[in-house]
Amino acid sequence: MRNQTFIIVGAGQAGAMAAATLRQQQFDGDIILIGKEYHAPYERPILSKDYLINPEEAPKYLFSEDFYLEKQIDLRIGQLVSQIMPSKHCVVLENGGKLRYDKLLLTMGARARRFPLLDQLGENIYTLRTLDDAQRLRQAVKKDKRILIVGGGVIGLELAATSCELGANVTVIEQADNIMGRCAPPLLQDYLLNRHQEKGVQFFLDTNIVSAQKQGSELVLILNTGEKVIGDIIIYGIGAEFRDQLAADAGLVTDGGIVIDSRCQTSEPDIFAAGDVCLQREPLTGDLQRRETWENANRQATIAAHAMMGLAPPQPGAPWFWTDQWGINIQMVGNMQAEEWHIQGDLQSDKAILFGTENEVLVGAVAINQGREMRNLRKLLANPAQVVSGVEWA
């Protein structure tokens, strides 16, 4: 493969890990890694936590500058690909330049879904997806500020905890009647809601914003309940818009994301995709699934790199992710939509394991401040046929 060129569009977690994996697997052709941001690839999980809390915290880059030089990875930051031409095996840069590829990997990720009702307020409206976003938030979140967080997902709750730790007064507004509804079982939702409320976070659940106004320096939201909430800053996280337009324009199959198979291959044989931008077909159900997690970006990057080289990909494990809120580490593995959940340990002491089962089969688990147990749980859930009939949970 010495004379081949592999191009990776998107220099985030998946893109950088794919480039590293290609070199690890002895790919000796050219690798070009193109990123829109003016930063080398960096870790995103810390942006809603340590990076905001500690003003001295530096960005955590995935690899050093020397790494890209030593591995002969051509990292091009601050560049944008404007077109893919599959029939000619080339990409067109925004400046008009063209680059030919033998294999192409798309890892463009996602952007924050916009909320025009809030955006029209102008200043002091924030989202969090990038390092630049985090740098702006770091300057805004201060002691005694009134912060309105719109969206009760993982990022919203992490920001709520972080903002409170910085001394701010925090209110969370969520359209659903629960928090973390897309990714957490009801037991965990209730547990986290209680912990946040104990720390002083105010919640408006099952609530919509019907009006948003700026009155002097204050931001005023009118809710469908008729209540009014006032803040100095609004941070919203209401989902993501996936950067699949480039692929759609090139004729690739998309469906609110780039559709890939188990090898991360798109509808074009020499084009692959990985990370948040993808929808992958589940082998058992045939359903298209998206997992917007750090672990999934790494896993798909590894699979895609192997597939691009014609190598057998590693076996995927059960999906896993984590969140840290109020000093509590919560790790989740497997299916969070299980029919039944069982508690082992004591939630009140912030140390427990939740086991999710369907038809007496273990399909998911949540470890609360039980990180040492997660390795075994991940191994256990890699085998979907573990029968748990007769297990004593308490």
Swiss-Prot record:
FAD binds at residues 5-36. Its EC number is 1.18.1.3. GO terms for biological process: 3-phenylpropionate catabolic process. One of its GO terms (molecular function) is 3-phenylpropionate dioxygenase activity. NAD(+) binds at residues 146-174. This dioxygenase system consists of four proteins: the two subunits of the hydroxylase component (HcaE and HcaF), a ferredoxin (HcaC) and a ferredoxin reductase (HcaD). Part of the multicomponent 3-phenylpropionate dioxygenase, that converts 3-phenylpropionic acid (PP) and cinnamic acid (CI) into 3-phenylpropionate-dihydrodiol (PP-dihydrodiol) and cinnamic acid-dihydrodiol (CI-dihydrodiol), respectively. This is 3-phenylpropionate/cinnamic acid dioxygenase ferredoxin--NAD(+) reductase component. It comes from Photorhabdus laumondii subsp. laumondii (strain DSM 15139 / CIP 105565 / TT01) (Photorhabdus luminescens subsp. laumondii).
